[in-house]
From Swiss-Prot:
A GO term from the CC aspect: bacterial nucleoid
The keyword DNA damage belongs to this UniProt entry's keyword annotation: yes
NCBIfam families, per the entry: reco
Superkingdom of the organism of origin: Bacteria
GO biological process: DNA recombination; double-strand break repair
Source organism: Synechococcus elongatus (strain ATCC 33912 / PCC 7942 / FACHB-805) (Anacystis nidulans R2)
Function per UniProt: Involved in DNA repair and RecF pathway recombination.
Keywords carried by this UniProt record: DNA damage, DNA recombination, DNA repair
Organismal lineage: Bacteria, Bacillati, Cyanobacteriota, Cyanophyceae, Synechococcales
Protein name (Swiss-Prot/TrEMBL): DNA repair protein RecO
One protein family per Pfam: RecO_N
Family stated for the protein in its record: Belongs to the RecO family.
InterPro entries reported in the protein's UniProt record: ARFGAP/RecO (IPR037278), DNA_rep/recomb_RecO_N (IPR022572), NA-bd_OB-fold (IPR012340), RecO (IPR003717), RecO_C (IPR042242)
Length: 266
């Protein structure tokens, strides 16, 4: 049996290990989630230093180990360095990465998940400030759909009654329940638990949410006010958190940016 193997992978997480090493969490299309040690990667002149930074995609040569495999060589394919140049881009990238980390399986091929993440990071990298939001929401929806968690937005998740946004009625609202799986018709009744999340969406917000999975292009940022984008992000995030059974830590930075008056570059 070979003691080494090669794979293409993206760095999802990198933490210091010992005096000079780096512990990496990688996602590979043919190996799934991998945890490997990059020996000496934190040394000033290490060839692995920049090649093991977050979001770097590379062809890797990995040696099998007793407890952890060791990364021996990396040939960088894409570095995504622009993601760290803008707080909104960085927050969106961390958001998607956290979702992927929660869904990926160790040592299990997941080419579609790998392709989705690489495509989404490349798209976000070309945006600035709040322009990342439409791309983030579409990417989040597709990751939820990949896992079988996409919310139901065209039909009531309890009665299966069609739900149409009444755009002519400014006060119209529809209930959105992450735990029940989507929107609720006016006639839908259930015993709501005290800690059960439920949001109220406007007609405009529901119409936009219904377009996200079917639109061939990303919705323009100017098509909705900031408050609407914030509500849509919250709805999809709550759906993800319900299935993951834990909060998305990276959403804190994104929410701060959404509620702030500007988005800064770093």
């Amino acid at each position: 049996m070979s003691r080494t193997y090669t794979t293409t992978a993206i760095v999802l997480k990198a933490t210091p290990l010992g005096e000079a090493d780096r512990l990496l969490t990688l996602l590979s299309p043919d190996q799934g989630l991998l945890r490997v040690v990059a020996t000496g990667a934190r040394k000033p002149r290490s060839k692995l230093g920049g090649r093991t930074a977050l979001f770097v995609v590379g062809d890797c040569l990995i040696a099998c180990g007793k407890s952890l495999d060791r990364l021996q060589q990396v040939e960088t394919l894409t570095s995504h360095t622009a993601l760290s140049g803008d707080l909104a881009r960085l927050a969106a990238a961390q958001y998607l990465t956290e979702l992927v980390l929660a869904q990926a399986l160790e040592r299990h091929p997941q080419p579609e998940l790998f392709a989705l993440l690489c495509r989404d990071l490349a798209r976000i990298e070309t945006q600035s400030g709040l322009e990342v939001l439409p791309y983030l929401l579409q990417s989040t929806w597709q990751l939820l759909a990949w896992a079988g968690w996409a919310p139901q937005t065209h039909y009531c998740c309890l009665t299966q009654q069609a739900v149409q946004p009444r755009l002519e009625q400014s006060r119209w609202r529809v209930r959105y329940s992450p735990s029940l799986g989507g929107v609720l018709a006016d006639t839908a009744a259930y015993q709501r638990r005290p800690n059960q999340r439920e949001l109220l969406l406007t007609a405009t917000e529901l119409a936009a949410l219904q377009q996200i999975p079917t639109s061939q292009t990303v919705l323009p940022l100017a098509s909705l006010p900031r408050e609407a984008w914030q509500m849509l992000e919250r709805a999809l995030r709550h759906s993800a958190e319900y299935h993951l059974e834990r909060p998305l830590q990276s959403a804190l930075l994104l929410e701060t940016l959404l509620t702030g008056s500007h988005v800064a570059s770093v």
